[in-house]
Every structure is written in C-alpha cells, then in structure tokens.
C-alpha cells in the first residue's frame, strides 16, 4: 500500500527535479527560450546557475595579534594624535571632510586672527582684510539687489490712494469749470459794454486775451494738482512706478540689461504722470470749445435788447 507524501516531501522532490533539469546547461537553454535570445546574441546567454562557483580558499592567515595588543596600539595612536598642536575636534574634522570650503575659510580666519603667514607675526597694513572685503561685497550686493526689487504696496493702500487721486482730480476739474463757464459766457456776450465798468474787467473779457488768461489758469490749477498728488504719494508711500498699472508688469518680466535704457520702469511711471496732467489740459480745451458753441447758440437764440441812447441835444 503506497503511502501518501507530505507537502514538504513533494516540494523537496520538485526541487531535486528542477536542479537535475537545470544541470549541464539546462538553465541557460531555458533562459534563452524565455528571453528569445539566439546563440550569436551580444547579450550574455549564460545563466547564473551554470556559472562555475568560486570557492573561497580556506587558507587564511590567522592573526597572531591578541586583543590586548590591538587596544594598546590604538591607545598609542590616539595619544599621538592628541599631542599634535592645533588638532581639531572630531566635529570640526567631520565638518571639514563633508564641506572642504568651510574648512578653507576656517583656516583663513585663523590665519587672520593669529597673524600667521606674515612677517614678524603681524599682518601687513597694505594687505586688505580678506573677510572684510568679502563682507563688504556681500553687503553691497544685497543692498543693490534690494534696490532693484520693486517696492510692493498693499492692495488696499493702493486702492485707497487711487480713490484719493480721483477725488482730488474731480475737485480740481469742477473748480476750473466753475470759473471757465461764466468767463466764456461774458466773452461770447454780444454786448461788450456790459462789463466795461472798469478797465481791468474790460481787458479780461477781451477776446484777444482769452488764450493767455486760460493758459494762466491752467498752469495754476495743474501746479496745485501736481503738488497735492506728490503729497498723497508721500503720505501713502506710493511711487509713480507702483501706480503705473499693467504696463510695468510686462516690463518687469524683461531681464535687466536687455533694454538700452536704464531704469525704464521709473521713466515710464513718470511719463504716465505727465501724460495724466497733459490730458487734464486737453480736457479743459475741449470743454471750452463746447462752451463756445453753446454760448454762441444761446446768445443767437435769445438776443439781448440793447438800450438805445437818446440823441444829445444840439447834435443833428
């Protein structure tokens, strides 16, 4: 009666069959069959199982040195290293090994402090301090980089500043138009003798003097507006560059040195301020031209009766 094999015995038999199958080059042929390699392939077609095993030689030289002698020699080496002057700690040695640049700067710093490498143990006065020069260069580089960076302002502060500027501009325009409207009315009046009570008023309402008086008023009001605008910029820490809008956002993407103009962002911001002031002058000119047309139509539609003076006695 045949006895049933256990699972361990079955695995053992399968392992032995596989080893017999892979012996004598069977592993290499199975590997080539799986990978599809041919015999003339450049890749290695020999299986690891078919490679000859290298048996390590058992003729190792036994060490005759006892543990006590090893400890003694190690202690002597440590004493010798500790007796060397200027020997660094293990932490400094590890730092020097991991970062040789740090070790070089530490050595140079020690030479600067001790005056080593100079005659008579003192540094030469004509030789610049290496670390002072490095620190000064680093400080100057950081300062210049900080100046080149745009000064960012809080969005709420910028919105409040723009609101104040719009309010100031509206007040200036309303005051100017309140003065220009009656002035144009009297200039376009068909009866010039209405305001001839004094010589000054007659000169003001003279049409030939209109452009000079209008330009003088514009210069005064634009100067007031520009000075108050600068005061708002100082109070809110806002510059012309920050208030320029989206144009400078595209210019900041251009690297420094590509454009031939230096500080082009500041120049464009200042040009936009001047353009704003010039646009106010052009707006007032357009307003005056409209007033001329309205007043001419008004006086022609509603003529004013001019009183006829009685004839002087004795004159026929």
Curated annotation (Swiss-Prot):
Cytoplasmic membrane side: 1-167, 230-276
Region of interest: Disordered: 1-75
GO cellular component terms, semicolon-separated: endoplasmic reticulum membrane; GET complex; Golgi membrane
Primary location recorded for the protein, binned into one broad class: endoplasmic reticulum
Keyword set, alphabetical order: Endoplasmic reticulum, ER-Golgi transport, Golgi apparatus, Membrane, Transmembrane, Transmembrane helix, Transport
Lumenal topological domain residue ranges: 188-209, 298-316
Biased composition (Basic and acidic residues): 7-19
Record's subcellular location: Endoplasmic reticulum membrane; Golgi apparatus membrane
Membrane topology category: Multi-pass membrane protein
Any one GO BP annotation for this protein: protein insertion into ER membrane
Segments passing through the bilayer: 168-187, 210-229, 277-297
InterPro entries assigned to the protein according to its UniProt record, in alphabetical order: GET2 (IPR014802), Get2/sif1 (IPR028143)
Superkingdom of origin organism: Eukaryota
Residue spans of biased composition, Polar residues class: 22-48, 56-65
HAMAP family: Get2
Entry's family note: Belongs to the GET2 family.
Reported function: Required for the post-translational delivery of tail-anchored (TA) proteins to the endoplasmic reticulum. Together with GET1, acts as a membrane receptor for soluble GET3, which recognizes and selectively binds the transmembrane domain of TA proteins in the cytosol. The GET complex cooperates with the HDEL receptor ERD2 to mediate the ATP-dependent retrieval of resident ER proteins that contain a C-terminal H-D-E-L retention signal from the Golgi to the ER.
Oligomer status and interactors: Component of the Golgi to ER traffic (GET) complex, which is composed of GET1, GET2 and GET3. Within the complex, GET1 and GET2 form a heterotetramer which is stabilized by phosphatidylinositol binding and which binds to the GET3 homodimer.
Name of protein: Golgi to ER traffic protein 2
């Amino acid at each position: 009666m045949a006895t049933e094999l256990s699972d361990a015995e079955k695995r053992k038999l399968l392992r032995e069959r596989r080893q017999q199958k892979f012996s004598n080059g069977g592993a290499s042929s199975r590997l080539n069959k799986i990978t599809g390699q041919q015999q003339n392939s450049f890749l290695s077609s020999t299986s690891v199982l078919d490679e000859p095993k290298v048996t390590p030689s058992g003729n190792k030289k036994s060490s005759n040195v006892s543990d006590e002698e090893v400890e003694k020699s190690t202690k002597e080496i440590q004493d010798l290293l500790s007796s060397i002057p200027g020997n660094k700690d293990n932490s400094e040695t590890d730092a020097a090994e991991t970062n040789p640049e740090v070790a070089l700067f530490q050595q140079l710093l020690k030479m600067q402090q001790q005056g080593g490498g100079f005659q008579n143990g003192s540094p030469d006065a004509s030789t610049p301090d290496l670390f002072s020069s490095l620190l000064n260069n680093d400080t100057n580089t950081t300062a210049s980089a900080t100046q080149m960076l745009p000064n960012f302002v809080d969005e709420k502060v910028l919105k409040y500043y723009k609101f104040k500027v719009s309010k100031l501009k509206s007040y200036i325009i309303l005051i100017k138009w309140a003065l220009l409207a009656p002035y144009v009315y009297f200039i376009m009046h068909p009866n010039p003798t209405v305001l001839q009570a004094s010589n000054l008023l007659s000169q003001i309402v003279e049409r030939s003097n209109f452009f000079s008086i209008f330009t003088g008023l514009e210069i005064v009001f634009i100067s007031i507006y520009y000075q108050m605008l600068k005061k708002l910029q100082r109070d809110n820490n806002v510059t012309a560059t920050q208030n320029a809008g989206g144009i400078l956002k595209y210019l900041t993407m251009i690297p420094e040195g590509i454009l031939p103009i230096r500080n082009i962002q500041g120049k464009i911001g200042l040009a936009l301020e001047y353009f704003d002031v010039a646009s106010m002058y052009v707006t007032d000119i357009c307003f005056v031209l409209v007033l001329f047309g309205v007043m001419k139509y008004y006086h022609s539609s509603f003529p004013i009766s001019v009183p006829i003076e009685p004839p002087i006695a004795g004159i026929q």
